[in-house]
């Protein structure tokens, strides 16, 4: 394989869970540690447009829908940003995704509500002063300004959305996920049908990597 499969699976799961609109559109990083190294995904960055903090018209607000595995973008007449869409065609990649969710990510999410409540208590005084200092209520300039209210209401909405999203993810990445897949298996972990894969990096750059076939799927 020409990629660090686990890093791609982890990056996918984080992007899918929070429905980050910027995934592969901007602030997306990957690296190789030398010419002979595989391609690693990460580190994660720029999540201000995640967790239901984006306009619904962008398609990133439904806690009961797949997002990251269906990302596509139309540029210069070409469909790009389809990394996860293509990787999901490979049963081996789906196996890694399912294993990483069930054994690594899911246990971490079990205490998310308690952690959120701890932060709510810690930040209470600062949050109140934030609204006083900046007069944030009902002000334009944020993607979800039409739904802004008290900071407590915002936290409640966040917790409700996360609860729904986590429940969906747990149901989605069961054992059947590996078998049914997203689309028919047609690729290898070493290459996407020997096609070039394009990754958007900022507004003015587009990097292309060609991954050669290595490990058959199925």
Residue ranges and their predicted role:
Residues 204-208:
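Intrinsic-disorder/low-complexity, polar/charged segments enriched in Ser/Thr/Lys/Arg/Asp/Glu/Gln
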Residues 1-25, 31-186:
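Middle-to-C-terminal accessory/interaction subdomains
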Residues 209-214:
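Acidic, Ser/Thr
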């Amino acid at each position: 394989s020409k990629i660090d499969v686990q890093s791609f699976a982890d990056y996918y799961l984080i992007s899918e869970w929070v429905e980050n609109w910027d995934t592969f559109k901007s602030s997306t990083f990957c690296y190789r540690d030398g010419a002979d190294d595989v391609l690693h995904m990460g580190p994660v960055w720029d999540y201000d447009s995640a967790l239901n903090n984006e306009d619904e018209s962008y398609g990133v607000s439904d806690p009961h829908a797949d997002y990251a595995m269906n990302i596509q973008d139309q540029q210069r007449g070409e469909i790009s940003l389809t990394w996860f869409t293509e990787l999901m065609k490979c049963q081996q990649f789906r196996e890694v995704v399912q294993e990483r969710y069930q054994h690594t990510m899911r246990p971490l999410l079990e205490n998310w509500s308690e952690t959120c409540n701890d932060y709510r208590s810690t930040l209470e005084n600062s949050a109140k002063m934030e609204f006083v200092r900046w007069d944030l209520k009902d002000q334009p300039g944020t993607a979800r300004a039409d739904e802004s209210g008290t900071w407590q209401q915002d936290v409640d909405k966040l917790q409700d959305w996360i609860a729904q999203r986590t429940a969906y993810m747990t149901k989605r990445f069961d054992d059947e996920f590996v078998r049914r897949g997203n689309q028919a298996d047609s690729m290898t972990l070493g290459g996407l049908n020997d096609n070039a894969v394009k990754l958007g990096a900022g507004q003015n750059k587009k990097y292309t990597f060609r991954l050669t076939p290595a490990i058959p799927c199925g």
